[in-house]
């Protein structure tokens, strides 16, 4: 029996374009954590989709609900996306049929890799072909490697593709490298390695009212604590709200001129928008880092600088393509 109580020896039912098993279907499964779902992951996802279509079965991406280092090393790893965003990107960009998040806990950490393959991937999820990256490791003490997995799969009559590393500008594409770019404020280079504009999603919350009264009206969202924070400063951005996309100027930081806030805020002035955004979901796409956050002698000086920021953002965004994940 699997974890849901379904018999693993259920009878087979043949569908039009896929082989179904009562209780579960056969799948082509991509394995990995997929933080950022970047250009390296893209090669893996495209191969997964291609194989699934060829074999006439659903495609699946199997990942974890948290970064394994949270359990293995007991450290917090700032991520590029939330779990919901990872699912959305995988489905929208690569048309993967299903995305599952396995719970990574101490039981998972200590599970031998062979048992994980046999019990979870083959028996529970019906894997008939697996796709992994060249550096994929899993199972107790990371003893499972891509090469060991491929050998075991061959002995079970299951396919296993190993995707080689992907390089751009002589640099291996990796989540770690992209996190460093975002932390440094290099939004443009991060977009090259992600394959889309880095974004932050959140609900608009009330600010202190200073911007709307003395400066420019802004929509404020809290910086998600689980995600890597872009470098403090001002960015040319685009903001998605209620299905519409607006050019914007966004400040990330603590607003030192008008009194520092205890938490990091993401404040966006939407160009050409008027109305109340409180309670609405905003998605802020980062296009270009314009300048560092700085403390001005007074609000008048700050307002003059924001006007300059708006002009610079408009000049850059006028020739920029629309965001990819909307």
Predicted regions and their residues:
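Phosphate/ribose-recognition catalytic cores of enzymes acting on nucleotide-derived substrates
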Residues: 3, 207-326
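Glycine-rich, Lys/Arg-enriched anion-binding loops that position phosphate/diphosphate groups
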Residues: 153-253
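A structural preference for short, hydrophobic beta-strand core positions in alpha/beta folds
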Residues: 61, 101, 162-163
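Generic structural signal for residues in well-ordered beta-strands
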Residues: 10-12, 99, 160
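N-terminal catalytic cores of NTP/NDP-binding nucleotidyl/phosphoryl-transfer enzymes
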Residues: 20-82
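Positively charged, low-complexity intrinsically disordered leader regions
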Residues: 1-31
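N-terminal Rossmann-like or analogous alpha/beta NTP/dinucleotide-binding catalytic cores
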Residues: 68-156
